[in-house]
Amino acid sequence: MNKPFGFIIFFIYLIASQLIAGCTIQPSEQSDIDVLQKHVEWLAHDDRLGRLSGSFGEADAANYISDYFAQTGLEPLGRAGTYLQQFTLTGEISEAMGVMNNRSRNVLGAIRGEEFPERYIVLGAHYDGQGRGGVISMNTEDRDVIHPSADDNASGTAVMMVLAERFAAEPAQVTILFAAFSGEEQGMLGSKHFTEEFLDGSVSAFGMINLDMVGRMTDNEVSIHGTESGNRWSDILSRINTDSLDVQIVSSRLGTSDHVPFHDAGIPAIHYHTGMHDDYHTDRDTAEKLNFSGMVKVADHAEKLIRELAREDPESFQFRQMNRRPNPVIEPGTPTLGVLPDYMFRGNGMRIDEVTSGDRADLAGLQPGDIIKSLNGMTVTNIFDYMNALESISENDSVELQYQRNEQLSTVTISF
């Protein structure tokens, strides 16, 4: 082979190799995917019985996370030199689920900061699930079945565990406190207990990042809620968003997860979330439906955020009180249309993201992208109006629903 021709072939080979490499999963990413899948499959296995707070399945999961923290080298921050912080389950949901006054536990560990060990950033995720569903199930038929709770929230727990390993290998300037909360499904009981008992003045956190439902990424999109809780969140996020993620900043809505008690305690707190889906709070929320490659992207982004936040001066990172709005969650027993709201929509009305086949909205001809403008005589300007309108409907009612499709308004009658 002559040299010029050989050089051309070699050059083409190099270019092709780079193109192929850019389209394949790198070894480090594949390793993270394997670890995430292992954690989720273990946590969401039927042997855990849905990880209901106060149950044997939840205790089993707590021990699993504790063992992982120990193997990873985290400092135990629970009671008596353990990783466990126990608390008692209370409230209406705990009573309805049959675990009233049962003991539950958070799992707490830390990687000390190399420069400012007295400064804390909290990275949290709730590891409890919906157990056998019951009053918190969104199943349309049998509610008394195991709810694997894979996306909600084995996904966030697994990402937190992977990040614990990363920070153990390369600590940040400040201490990172890793908190696996329980009792979230009963009203954020674990995170409330943590903020009341642990953050009691002797320990001060200047920022909190919550990972809840981060396993169903589509179109490289992730939303971050609660950025108005701190004066520097938006600036920090703008500096780190250099990858392919489409980050949706939901600044005006705090959300409803374990970052809320931190906000209420005066700590800037945000929430990573990859979106709602039809399997939410059902027995269909299973491990094989998760986007593990997307979860690696969430982990990468959250790591960048934490390392950037660790460089901030806590004195300049100031808390901002956000307005608390009613939770955009359908109460158990409320009649439903069989639609999934588009939580990213900022226009006037409630835009439909998904329609459940065979349910009321589907039978009435509604489609994804339709914008509900009124329901049961009540104007719908946002998701909160929509929830209130649903709660005004009783069984056997027939109500009118007005919706917009391609700038055209239409009205249908729906029977409940």
Identify the role of each PLM range.
Residues 26-29, 46-56, 94-98, 142-153, ...:
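Second-shell loop/turn segments in exported
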Residues 31, 35-38, 42, 56-71, ...:
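Extracytoplasmic/secreted proteins, especially bacterial periplasmic and envelope-associated proteins
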Residues 51-111:
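A non-catalytic alpha/beta surface segment that caps or lines the substrate-entry region
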Residues 109, 123-128, 134-188, 302:
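Alpha-helical metal-binding/catalytic segments enriched in His/Glu/Asp
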Residues 278-324:
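His/Asp/Glu-rich mid-to-C-terminal helical/loop segments that flank catalytic regions of hydrolases
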